[in-house]
From Swiss-Prot:
Cofactor binding, per record: Binds 1 heme group per subunit.
Family annotation (Gene3D superfamilies): 1.20.58.480
Any Pfam family hit: Trp_dioxygenase
Protein name, as recorded: Tryptophan 2,3-dioxygenase
Alphabetical GO biological process terms: L-tryptophan catabolic process to acetyl-CoA; L-tryptophan catabolic process to kynurenine
Keywords on record: Dioxygenase, Heme, Iron, Metal-binding, Oxidoreductase, Tryptophan catabolism
Gene: kynA
Enzyme class: oxidoreductase
Length: 284
């Protein structure tokens, strides 16, 4: 529709009741603290592509902040036998992981020569040093005491990461819920050293098999198993895209943090977070 000679184009573009004066009101930018957020990118090199590298990792950290928020809330809900809210939170975590998976496509537009030009400016900084990522790994049950060390230089960060390291994981709380539901979960899975990686247990698998064979009776437990499956499936996809993106950009060079790079990341693909939920699919 074209404006008539007596109409101002602005009257068509703007809703007449839209708030346009923010001299004394909170604006969109004020609410989101956009000055601070958009002022947090400080390239160290003259390379055009460093902005992509920074924004990729900063946005990933924002999504991980939301993941931690949802994971902690889901764990608390499971502890209180509030399964429906927990399902919503776990589904959201899986969707966040989808966002993180697709983000690798953007970073993959960086070619090997482009990354090589900015790599010297990164020093020994590396993604495995992310204190939010480490907390996510710990909350999902991948406990490794050595990964506390990169945060030892900051007592405040170390305290956060250590708290996740020492707490029961999401899967630990899922097994506790099964036990409270009357299922035969062995004491060794319910009372153990939470700082140690979880080891698969045949009796735990039998408990999950009961859930899956009698899903109508154990509907919440069954749904919990499937939400955990969705989450680990999404996490595996994220790990895989991480490996392929890194290999595409740096090949088999060592990582900036001193790891073996792609070789190290491929080993992470072998980590199984919720082993019995996957094994039961063969045994059903």
């Amino acid at each position: 529709m074209q404006p008539t000679p007596t109409q101002r184009p602005e009257a068509i573009v703007h809703d007449e009741k839209a708030q346009l004066d923010f001299a004394r009101d909170m604006s969109y930018g004020d609410y989101l603290h956009l000055d601070e957020l958009l002022g947090a990118q400080h390239p160290l090199s003259p390379e055009h592509n460093e902005m992509l590298f920074i924004v990729q990792h900063q946005t990933s950290e924002l999504w991980m902040k939301l993941m931690l928020h949802e994971l902690r809330a889901a764990i608390a809900a499971i502890q209180q036998d509030r399964l429906q809210p927990a399902f919503k939170m776990l589904a959201r975590v899986s969707k966040i992981l989808e966002q993180l998976v697709s983000a690798w496509d953007v970073l993959a537009t960086m070619t090997p020569p482009e990354y090589s030009a900015l790599r010297p400016y990164l020093a020994h900084s590396s993604g495995f040093q992310s204190y939010q990522y480490r907390q996510i790994e710990y909350l999902l049950g991948n406990k490794n005491a050595a990964m506390l060390q990169p945060h030892a230089h900051r007592a405040d960060l170390l305290a956060q990461v250590r708290a996740a390291f020492e707490a029961p994981s999401l899967y630990d709380e899922a097994l506790r819920f099964l036990a409270r539901s009357g299922l035969a979960v062995p004491a060794g899975a319910l009372q153990r050293d939470w700082t140690q990686p979880y080891r698969a247990d045949d009796q735990v698998e039998q408990a999950w098999l009961t859930v899956y064979r009698q899903s109508e009776r154990y509907w919440n437990q069954y749904q919990l198993g499937e939400k955990l499956t969705d989450l680990e499936d999404a996490f595996r996809l994220w790990r895989f895209r991480h490996v392929t993106t890194v290999e595409r950009i740096i090949g088999f060079k060592r990582g900036t943090g001193g790891t073996s790079g792609v070789t190290y990341l491929r080993k992470m693909l072998e980590v199984v977070l919720f082993p019995e939920i996957w094994k039961l699919r063969t045994d059903l």
